Amino acid sequence: MIITKSWLNDWLELEEISSDKIAKTLNSIGIEVDRVGALKAPDKVVVGYVKEKIKHENSDKLSICQVDIGSETLQIVCGAANVDAGQFVAVATKGAIMPNGMEIKEAKLRGVDSCGMLCSSLELGFEKINEGIMLLDESIGKLELGRPLNTYEIFNDELIEVELTPNRGDCLSIYGIARDLAAALNLNLKEPKPFKESENVLGIGRILRLAAEKELNGLYNYRAIGLKEEIQTNLLLSLRLAQIEGLGKNSIENLLNYATHSTGVLFNAYDLSSFSEKDEEFIINLSKQVHGETKVSYKDKLLSFSGIFQNNESRCKDDSKIIIIEANYTDPLVIADAKIYHKDQDEKMLYRSFRGSEPKLNLGMDFLLGIFEHIPNLVIYSSSQQILTDKELPIIPISIEGISDIIGQNVDKDEVLKILKKLGFELILSGEGLINVKAPLHRPDIKNLSDICEEVVRIIGIDNIASKGLEFIEKNRLNSAYKNYIEFLNLRKRAVASGYFESLHYVLDNGEELKRLGFDSVKLKLINPITAELNTLRTTLLNHLLNAASLNAKNSKKIIKLFELGAVFNVNNQELNRIAFIHSGLKEEAKISNKAKPESVQFYDFLLDIKNIIGDFKLKSSKYNILSPYEQADIYLSDIKVGFIGRLHLKIENERDLPKTYICELDLDLIRQDFKIAKPYSKFPAITRDLSVLIPKGFEYNQIKNCIEELNLEILENFRLVDIYSDENLKEFYSITISFSFRDINKTLEDNQVNECMDKILNTLKNLGLDLR
């Protein structure tokens, strides 16, 4: 969105306010300024008058002009095709430095002296407005010969480009920007004077009638204009339109574009003569379409869809004699819903209507007619035809205390009311300190108290709000369902990190397969199972995982690592949460380190994976028919059995066509991850000792472990089994080696402290009937 200071001056008194302050103010109220740049004609460029023009004898394209600049008459050779006697022009005199760096000097062109240059707008550093030189007129101010061009406001201006968010369609006009600036700078907004109807002219009812359906989603205002000759766009409008890339060849379209950019009101101009016969009444039909948009038509001929596009055949031409001017507004929500159903679209029109154009149609029409009335040989038909549907605006109750609470500091009631009034809000004071607020139609984004607070803060300035810590008072929203979700999510992440892929299966299973695996069936049977294979609720996750692993093995997968987390049911139909794992086949892929001969998965590998997923646990002997009698165990956490682990029985491996396979199933409700309390790390070195102990075959290491833990030796950091050895000489015994690590957190240990602990450990082992090797 491009604005200039001089254009803003049409709506606000900004002569005493610098462009820098305007830019800072715009930024502070949420209208982001992209750039600020000067638009100034060079020095020594003055107003001149072409007194005489003759052809150059030695050139077909050059003319010799006598140009009066007040103090003298200059002879200037000019190559512009549009130069002629009787014109006011911009004259660059000797010594002028042009924007491209060229210095104007006296010169001879084809043997004729030339003492200056007649300039185009492009040569002066402005946008191009026409072919040839720029012709001056009094739209820029009174023309005085010899007056420096940069003393005219339009030629000594500053351009401001702003970036608008999609919800600020109300600022897509000079009037909209000025409205916000008026509130921020406490200025009065200039409104266009209501158009004064001329006497002794025909009324619009003679040539135009509206036929409209009820409940249209829009507002409409029509005026008629009679043209006796083609009109021209004056210099001021041309320069401003060129700055916003809105200058076209059709003068009527140019005036509409100018009025739209100035006021924000959308306009269409229809050529009456191209549709209706002479002396025929022009009846405009307005009908609401399926998606809420309004179709504007004459008989069976489409004129436009409001806010979406205008039919090119209905547009006014250079030779149009009677034109109908339409100012319209359509609810932006309707445009958003309807635009996708129209192949033909006017992007510039949609850009405004989709964000919300200015609904003050009379303001826009008065502004446009104020331009038309200064154009000669033109008749403005009296009166207008309007369709103004009353849209009930929502009422937002507010209080100054509520606004102060949200903002974080007390705000003055009068200041709040003044800000809201300047922004166009309707205020209705009620009892008990409440104020009912109606947001203006041009601000459809204002929905609640928070939006109103944002408007107040925007105008006051966020920098003027004192910083204050926010107090968040909120009850704990962490319930058991959320905690379960986080717990299960973390388990899934750790399983995936260990190389396992998650499987998902139906909660139904094959009862016969479960029975063969040794699992009980639920008491209640399914009356109408979806398939014969899924005829009961599952009591384990393992059967589905075994079937999935078997399918993968048949598809030549060498490493099969799967897990599933889900619900199972006990024999009493109670739902339980379980997680199960399966690792079948090879331990790793073939690679250089294993000489392309990877080993099959081992029990220890599988145990290590489970430890990485659920943490430390203990193993105790078990007896499950589904598992190998030589490689199986129950898993305990804090002396509570939470599941089992082991190798799948060889018979079942063969039945399912599986390679070496290990499985594990755990009760999710029993493996909660408690918060670990961090302890300080000792800076002092550890002392290690090893013991080799003879134990009978079949003796459980857990007995040794439990007895040592019961000693509660303060300096014993950890101990672990590091070796198991047997040979013929040991007969019915194993030799196991246990490594002990001792450390004090406060000091370096002495040997006698460690020896004392080792003696206690040896006595404990003797009490178990064990001897050193």
UniProtKB/Swiss-Prot annotation:
Cofactor comment: Binds 2 magnesium ions per tetramer.
InterPro entries: aa-tRNA-synth_II/BPL/LPL (IPR045864), B3/B4_tRNA-bd (IPR005146), DNA-bd_dom_put_sf (IPR009061), Fdx_antiC-bd (IPR005121), Fdx_antiC-bd_sf (IPR036690), NA-bd_OB-fold (IPR012340), Phe-tRNA-ligase_IIc_bsu (IPR045060), Phe-tRNA-ligase_IIc_bsu_bact (IPR004532)
Catalytic activity, reaction form: tRNA(Phe) + L-phenylalanine + ATP = L-phenylalanyl-tRNA(Phe) + AMP + diphosphate + H(+)
MF (Gene Ontology): ATP binding; magnesium ion binding; phenylalanine-tRNA ligase activity; tRNA binding
Gene3D superfamilies: 3.30.56.10, Bira Bifunctional Protein, Domain 2, Ferrodoxin-fold anticodon-binding domain, Nucleic acid-binding proteins, Phenylalanyl-trna Synthetase, Chain B, domain 3
GO cellular component: phenylalanine-tRNA ligase complex
SMART domains cross-referenced by the UniProt entry: B3_4, B5, FDX-ACB
UniProt-annotated binding residues for Mg(2+): D445, D451, E454, E455
Residue stretches making up the tRNA-binding domain: 39-150
SUPFAM superfamilies: Anticodon-binding domain of PheRS, Class II aaRS and biotin synthetases, Nucleic acid-binding proteins, PheT/TilS domain, Putative DNA-binding domain
Protein name in the entry: Phenylalanine--tRNA ligase beta subunit
Protein's organism: Campylobacter jejuni (strain RM1221)
Taxonomic lineage from the root: Bacteria, Pseudomonadati, Campylobacterota, Epsilonproteobacteria, Campylobacterales
